Protein backbone atom coordinates (compact mmCIF):
# COMPACT_ATOMS: atom_id res chain seq x y z
CA UNK A 1 0.00 0.00 0.00
CA UNK A 2 2.83 2.39 0.85
CA UNK A 3 4.50 1.68 -2.49
CA UNK A 4 1.34 2.58 -4.37
CA UNK A 5 1.07 5.89 -2.53
CA UNK A 6 4.77 6.61 -3.08
CA UNK A 7 4.33 5.92 -6.79
CA UNK A 8 1.31 8.25 -7.02
CA UNK A 9 3.18 11.01 -5.20
CA UNK A 10 6.23 10.49 -7.44
CA UNK A 11 4.09 10.90 -10.55
CA UNK A 12 2.45 14.03 -9.14
CA UNK A 13 5.85 15.44 -8.20
CA UNK A 14 7.16 14.72 -11.70
CA UNK A 15 4.30 16.70 -13.22
CA UNK A 16 4.65 19.61 -10.79
CA UNK A 17 8.45 19.71 -11.08
CA UNK A 18 8.20 19.95 -14.85
CA UNK A 19 5.97 22.98 -14.52
CA UNK A 20 8.06 24.59 -11.77
CA UNK A 21 11.32 24.15 -13.68
CA UNK A 22 9.89 25.54 -16.90
CA UNK A 23 7.94 28.48 -15.47
CA UNK A 24 9.14 29.44 -11.99
CA UNK A 25 12.93 29.02 -11.98
CA UNK A 26 14.59 32.19 -13.27
CA UNK A 27 18.21 31.12 -12.75
CA UNK A 28 20.10 31.53 -16.06
CA UNK A 29 22.22 28.46 -15.24
CA UNK A 30 19.13 26.27 -15.46
CA UNK A 31 18.60 25.72 -19.15
CA UNK A 32 16.30 23.28 -20.89
CA UNK A 33 15.67 20.62 -18.24
CA UNK A 34 13.40 17.61 -18.58
CA UNK A 35 12.30 15.63 -15.54
CA UNK A 36 12.52 12.02 -16.70
CA UNK A 37 11.65 10.22 -13.46
CA UNK A 38 11.06 10.72 -9.74
CA UNK A 39 11.63 8.04 -7.11
CA UNK A 40 10.10 8.59 -3.68
CA UNK A 41 11.02 6.42 -0.70
CA UNK A 42 8.27 4.43 0.99
CA UNK A 43 8.24 6.74 4.01
CA UNK A 44 7.90 9.78 1.70
CA UNK A 45 10.91 11.47 3.27
CA UNK A 46 13.22 11.59 0.25
CA UNK A 47 12.73 12.04 -3.47
CA UNK A 48 15.35 11.39 -6.13
CA UNK A 49 14.65 13.44 -9.26
CA UNK A 50 16.23 12.26 -12.51
CA UNK A 51 16.78 15.02 -15.05
CA UNK A 52 17.93 15.27 -18.63
CA UNK A 53 19.71 18.41 -19.84
CA UNK A 54 20.44 19.52 -23.38
CA UNK A 55 24.00 20.71 -23.83
CA UNK A 56 27.58 19.81 -23.10
CA UNK A 57 29.07 18.66 -19.80
CA UNK A 58 29.64 22.22 -18.55
CA UNK A 59 26.01 23.10 -19.21
CA UNK A 60 24.93 20.00 -17.29
CA UNK A 61 27.09 20.89 -14.30
CA UNK A 62 25.85 24.51 -14.33
CA UNK A 63 22.27 23.28 -14.42
CA UNK A 64 22.87 20.92 -11.51
CA UNK A 65 24.46 23.77 -9.53
CA UNK A 66 21.51 26.07 -10.29
CA UNK A 67 19.02 23.39 -9.25
CA UNK A 68 20.86 22.69 -6.02
CA UNK A 69 20.77 26.42 -5.18
CA UNK A 70 17.03 26.54 -5.91
CA UNK A 71 16.28 23.32 -4.01
CA UNK A 72 14.61 25.12 -1.09
CA UNK A 73 12.34 27.14 -3.38
CA UNK A 74 11.45 24.04 -5.40
CA UNK A 75 10.65 22.09 -2.25
CA UNK A 76 8.41 24.86 -0.92
CA UNK A 77 6.58 25.05 -4.27
CA UNK A 78 6.04 21.28 -4.19
CA UNK A 79 4.76 21.60 -0.62
CA UNK A 80 2.25 24.25 -1.69
CA UNK A 81 1.01 22.22 -4.64
CA UNK A 82 0.87 18.74 -3.09
CA UNK A 83 -0.75 18.35 0.30
CA UNK A 84 1.63 16.27 2.40
CA UNK A 85 2.47 16.34 6.07
CA UNK A 86 6.15 16.68 5.21
CA UNK A 87 7.53 17.52 1.79
CA UNK A 88 10.22 15.04 0.69
CA UNK A 89 13.87 16.11 0.63
CA UNK A 90 14.82 16.49 -3.03
CA UNK A 91 18.05 15.37 -4.68
CA UNK A 92 18.76 15.87 -8.38
CA UNK A 93 20.65 13.36 -10.52
CA UNK A 94 21.35 13.07 -14.22
CA UNK A 95 19.44 10.38 -16.08
CA UNK A 96 22.10 8.48 -17.98
CA UNK A 97 19.58 6.04 -19.48
CA UNK A 98 18.88 8.26 -22.49
CA UNK A 99 22.56 8.56 -23.38
CA UNK A 100 23.09 4.83 -22.90
CA UNK A 101 20.08 4.09 -25.09
CA UNK A 102 21.43 6.34 -27.84
CA UNK A 103 24.83 4.68 -27.59
CA UNK A 104 23.30 1.20 -27.87
CA UNK A 105 21.15 2.30 -30.80
CA UNK A 106 24.24 3.65 -32.59
CA UNK A 107 26.10 0.39 -32.02
CA UNK A 108 23.17 -1.66 -33.33
CA UNK A 109 22.84 0.61 -36.36
CA UNK A 110 26.56 0.18 -37.11
CA UNK A 111 26.22 -3.61 -36.84
CA UNK A 112 23.44 -3.62 -39.42
CA UNK A 113 25.56 -1.77 -42.00
UniProtKB/Swiss-Prot annotation:
Keywords: Cytoplasm, Ribosome biogenesis. Pfam families: RBFA. GO terms for biological process: maturation of SSU-rRNA. PANTHER family: RIBOSOME-BINDING FACTOR A, CHLOROPLASTIC-RELATED (PTHR33515:SF1). Belongs to the RbfA family. Monomer. Binds 30S ribosomal subunits, but not 50S ribosomal subunits or 70S ribosomes. This is Ribosome-binding factor A. It comes from Oceanobacillus iheyensis (strain DSM 14371 / CIP 107618 / JCM 11309 / KCTC 3954 / HTE831). The gene is rbfA.
Amino acid sequence: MAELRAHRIAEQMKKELGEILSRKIKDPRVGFVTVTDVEVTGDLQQAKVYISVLGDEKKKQDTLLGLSKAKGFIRSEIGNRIRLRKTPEITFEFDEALEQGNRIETILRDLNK
